[in-house]
Amino acid sequence: MAYLFLDAGDSVALSEPVYPGAMAAFRAFTERFIPVPLDAQGMITTELERLLAKRKAAGESLPKFIYDVPNGNNPAGVSLSPERRGHLLQLASKYDLLILEDDPYQLVQLEDRDPLPTLQSLDPEERVVRLDSFSKIFAPGLRLGYASGPAEIIRYFQL
């Protein structure tokens, strides 16, 4: 995703703390990040909204995409609440942004509840590119993952 979308000078909005592996991948292409704090309900989307509005009002470029691990955020361990999932999608629509949903823990539910819906399943505008993995439930050593999303984006993932 970083290779496909990031050019020098581009920025990425992401929850902080962020998964170190993702940060390493992004840093190969940019050093500009818009950190968004999180709490027990995940990324604080009202803070993201404030940061995006501030950048837009100042004439600054918006991030190329929003990156989040919505279930079992690594390293924080929190999940994005249903309300914030909806708000995040509203912000992506309002500011014409993509969301990179890195969700290797969707199938690993440690709580006694139904899994939360994926951002992609809630997205009527095809703004979400979803990264999934079998590594957490099947074979951790294989590092087996896949991406799904809008066809016009996923076609660039083909080998």
Predicted regions and their residues:
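Conserved core of the PLP fold type I
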Residues: 1-95, 106-125
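Conserved core segment of the aminotransferase class I/II
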Residues: 121-159
